[in-house]
Swiss-Prot record:
Family membership: Belongs to the DapB family.
Function: Catalyzes the conversion of 4-hydroxy-tetrahydrodipicolinate (HTPA) to tetrahydrodipicolinate.
EC number: 1.17.1.8
GO CC list: cytosol
Record pathway: Amino-acid biosynthesis; L-lysine biosynthesis via DAP pathway; (S)-tetrahydrodipicolinate from L-aspartate: step 4/4
List of residues binding NAD(+): G9, I10, N11, G12, K13, M14, G78, T79, T80, A104, P105, N106, F107
Any single GO BP term: diaminopimelate biosynthetic process
Pfam families for the chain: DapB_C, DapB_N
Species name: Coxiella burnetii (strain RSA 493 / Nine Mile phase I)
GO molecular function: 4-hydroxy-tetrahydrodipicolinate reductase; NAD binding; NADP binding; oxidoreductase activity, acting on CH or CH2 groups, NAD or NADP as acceptor
Binding site for (S)-2,3,4,5-tetrahydrodipicolinate: H135, G144, T145
Catalytic activity: (S)-2,3,4,5-tetrahydrodipicolinate + NAD(+) + H2O = (2S,4S)-4-hydroxy-2,3,4,5-tetrahydrodipicolinate + NADH + H(+); (S)-2,3,4,5-tetrahydrodipicolinate + NADP(+) + H2O = (2S,4S)-4-hydroxy-2,3,4,5-tetrahydrodipicolinate + NADPH + H(+)
Protein name: 4-hydroxy-tetrahydrodipicolinate reductase
């Protein structure tokens, strides 16, 4: 039986690409798409949606996720902006409803592997900085992927305070790790995690050329979320 899917934010750039690609997935049925003016809860109920893919805005994503869960569907969220406290609240709601949810800063399998390998490298290299580069239309900075990478590396290190540099050109500190953000036309999605030690450096880099690089991860999440009864944060926890 096919999984009934709604795309919330279907008129956005990511929503349109998901719509174009989902028709090739025989086990995923696109039953509706919603935007700002639509009643999301009513749409979930009338279409009997199993999964709602959310690519909306940082300002609305938490409210959207609560609506999805309370309406009995499973959120697959690629929108950035959720805090760890909000993710914990959503997880509690999922467990109460016995519904799965997936929140992923990046659905690209290559980007997720970059984060995973960076976490492993942090065992051996205590000094690290992150450079993330995106197209000029990207709203948030640092990117959700860079913040998640810093969190994962931070798990492997003794805690460091996020004290800002006196020189702001040195970047923003997350989990004790400097992050440098670049926004330019001609770029899409690129991140380098650069480790340094005596006499050597190690760079782990991922380059996403267009939004299609996230499609396998998104569709995998739509299938995996049906097996869960709690929230999973990060696609790396599904690989």
């Amino acid at each position: 039986m096919a999984i009934n899917v709604i795309i919330n934010g279907i008129n956005g750039k990511m929503g349109r690409v998901v719509k174009e690609n989902i028709t090739a997935q025989s086990d995923l049925e696109l039953v509706s798409g919603t935007g700002r003016q639509d009643d999301l809860a009513k749409t979930i109920q009338t279409t009997h949606a199993d999964v709602v893919i959310d690519f909306t805005t940082p300002q609305s994503v938490f409210h959207n996720a609560e609506i999805i869960i309370q309406s009995g569907a499973r959120p697959v969220i690629g929108t950035t902006g959720l805090t760890l406290e909000q993710i914990a609240l959503l997880d509690k709601q999922c467990r109460n409803k016995k519904l799965g949810a997936i929140v992923a800063p990046n659905f690209s399998v290559g980007a997720v592997l970059m984060m995973k390998y960076a976490k492993e490298a942090a065992h051996y290299f205590p000094d690290v900085e992150i450079i993330e580069m995106h197209h000029s239309q990207k709203i948030d900075a640092p990117s959700g992927t860079a913040i998640k990478t810093a969190q994962m590396i931070g798990e492997m290190r003794s805690s460091k305070k996020d004290e800002p540099f006196k020189d702001r050109a040195r970047g923003e500190i997350k989990n004790g790790i400097p992050i440098h953000s670049i926004r330019l036309p001609g770029l899409f999605s690129h991140q380098s995690v650069i480790f340094g030690s005596n006499g050597e450096t190690l760079t782990i880099r991922h380059d996403g050329m267009d939004r299609n690089c996230t499609m396998p991860g998104i569709f995998m999440a739509c299938r995996k979320v049906m097996e869960l009864d709690y929230l999973v944060y990060g696609l790396e926890n599904l690989l």
